Amino acid sequence: MIKITFPDGSVREYNEGVNGLQIAESISSRLAQDVLACGVNGETYDLGRPINEDADFVLYKWDDEEGKHAFWHTSAHLLAEALQELYPGIQFGIGPAIENGFYYDVDPGEAVIKESDLPAIEAKMLELSAKKDAVVRESISKTDALKMFGDRGETYKCELISELEDGHITTYTQGAFTDLCRGPHLMTTAPIKAIKLTTVAGAYWRGHEDRKMLTRIYGITFPKKKMLDEYLVLLEEAKKRDHRKIGKEMQLFMFSETVGKGLPMWLPKGTALRLRLQEFLRRIQTRYDYQEVITPPIGNKLLYVTSGHYAKYGKDAFQPIHTPEEGEEYFLKPMNCPHHCEIYKNFPRSYKDLPLRIAEFGTVCRYEQSGELHGLTRVRSFTQDDAHIFCRPDQVKDEFLRVMDIISIVFRSMNFQNFEAQISLRDKVNREKYIGSDDNWEKAEQAIIEACEEKGLPAKIEYGEAAFYGPKLDFMVKDAIGRRWQLGTIQVDYNLPERFELEYMGSDNQKHRPVMIHRAPFGSMERFVAVLIEHTAGKFPLWLTPDQVAILPISEKFNEYAEQVKMYLKMHEIRAIVDDRNEKIGRKIRDNEMKRIPYMLIVGEKEAENGEVSVRRQGEGDKGTMKYEEFAKILNEEVQNMINKW
């Protein structure tokens, strides 16, 4: 018998070889109908996969990320099965589940798959799913795998198999389709009831631009048609909120092919927005005792060899810069942490000096393939709101609590009211790959869990997801239309202090290694602004928005009065512009609403005579007429009330 421990701490005994579905059925037949996959000691299993040892166990349904992952992974195989029937001779690359759906990279040979072909492929997928074929997992030797896929002419699969270790190869079969795959999957194709293939794109095999361009087909599936219909409505709303579209309308940022792909340029209004975000975080960091530094935009190759980043990320770096005299190699800075380690080393440190908190808005450069670039969310140059905390092991929990306070202030100030966290810990079994002592790891992991509990932060624990150098805490926010975005990270690091031989003198007069904590509440300025645009649809909080007020004279003879009002507002630290175009007032109102300017002040003869303005609020319409001095007071009070909440 084996012991199965459930999330509530209860324990049941089952026969060795029991599977997830049988465990679900032993609890409730209704539950067994709803489950899609299960977790066994932190690893996601198919429901039919045997469990042969004592295990921590959890069942996953549609509402769980792991449940959706298994559902969409099987959907990718269903897509491949449909393509195999419709396009004889097609070859398959990879077909993973992704955050919202799945894709499959295929080589259709002479055929060309276009977006107009997608409805026919969807119909074939629905036909196949209706057969309710079982999805069967099988372990296979490397020799047999190479023969099976080689006989089918699957060169891409054979390439993948050649790199795998014998004894760790599995296939999944449904109907007439067999794929090389680790899983997990559904037990049958029956739950896949609603299908939408969304896009056809090109993708280089294995992401290398010197390899063949394959056809990538994206899709999403659901267990009910109603869910798909709701998703399609959400998709339309997401298009309206696309930060690339709104950023252009609001004149926040731009890209230029001449400057280079993936290199955003901030226009005056976007720069004003970004600088206010930075100043906002600076004020908070000052309160929490951070010291700001500035480091160079490049670094010697030796710096990144020491840090280990050269070996791990060298292929993602831009080509080195060679100095003509010394013949040294320099790289555009891909991250800020090695520079901050050197700052730490600049002075002898005592246990009394810790924690030391170093912050920087540091611009970094990383090479991303052209096909991966996307607006501000995936770029080749971006600015991180980076900070590194050097502390003693016994200070880790307190530092996590402080950083969590900062992140909470940031999110709530931007009206992200719904957020949760993921705690990434070591693998429960395989611990050889992690650097640092077991004692330090256990203390850090427990500190993170306790910090989340103390703050009442909903947190999901993922075993085996920690980096080799330390556990971490990732924050996920939910935007106005329900999408989840990863923003903000706190990461413990035992690796860099070791590599840079960082030390402090302890109270015992012995030298000790500090613990390093990486943190970035925004993540990067570019990504955060993109998410904020899509969350607010460009209607930023009043204190943050680039232009708070647009003054609209009804004709050119009131332009002078409009300028007078503008100057008064600016003297009272209100960001105002005058729209003095020779356009009808209705057109001016519509255009400035399109620019998401919160307040519009309409001025004509009556207003000019009485020193007044007619006030309109974005989304609320007419707010009446008042003296412009009174309006300035009301607006500043509104802004101050927002700021006081920080």
UniProtKB/Swiss-Prot annotation:
Zn(2+) binds at C337, H388, H518. Residues 1-61 form the TGS domain. Keywords: Aminoacyl-tRNA synthetase, ATP-binding, Cytoplasm, Ligase, Metal-binding, Nucleotide-binding, Protein biosynthesis, RNA-binding, tRNA-binding, Zinc. One of its GO terms (molecular function) is metal ion binding. The keyword ATP-binding applies. GO terms for biological process: threonyl-tRNA aminoacylation. Pfam families: HGTP_anticodon (PF03129), TGS (PF02824), tRNA-synt_2b (PF00587), tRNA_SAD (PF07973). Its EC number is 6.1.1.3. InterPro entries: aa-tRNA-synt_IIb, aa-tRNA-synth_II, aa-tRNA-synth_II/BPL/LPL, Anticodon-bd, Anticodon-bd_dom_sf, Beta-grasp_dom_sf, TGS, TGS-like. It catalyses: tRNA(Thr) + L-threonine + ATP = L-threonyl-tRNA(Thr) + AMP + diphosphate + H(+). Its cofactor is Zn(2+). Residues 242-541 are annotated as: Catalytic. Its main location: cytoplasm. Binds 1 zinc ion per subunit. It is found in: Cytoplasm. Belongs to the class-II aminoacyl-tRNA synthetase family. Homodimer. This is Threonine--tRNA ligase. It comes from Bacteroides thetaiotaomicron (strain ATCC 29148 / DSM 2079 / JCM 5827 / CCUG 10774 / NCTC 10582 / VPI-5482 / E50). The lineage of its organism: Bacteria, Pseudomonadati, Bacteroidota, Bacteroidia, Bacteroidales.
